[in-house]
């Protein structure tokens, strides 16, 4: 089965939860999206882009690599460190290189969902983020 979400739907959800817009676009390959973020720097706002690639989906874990250039990657590592102390931070495990593991089973709500479905893949096309899953026998 597939769940298809438009990038606009995902951006609106993030904005409703985080209070900040986070535009998302197709990244040019079936497992990569481009995320952009406006950062206020001194007297002007600068848009920073980051490529996120889903490397692996298995057993409720999602391995993601990120690439935005040396300075951006450093800022992402700092943001990951800060996110670990926030609600949902238990899901995030920094890995070597520019990679993170999202351990969905460590979150009660996501864990309950994973009891009912097997997450197979997350991929992207020009319009949608596509979550491929199969229901588990109950």
Q: Residue spans of the language-model regions?
A:
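Extracellular/lumenal and peripheral-membrane lipid-interaction modules
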Residues: 1-138
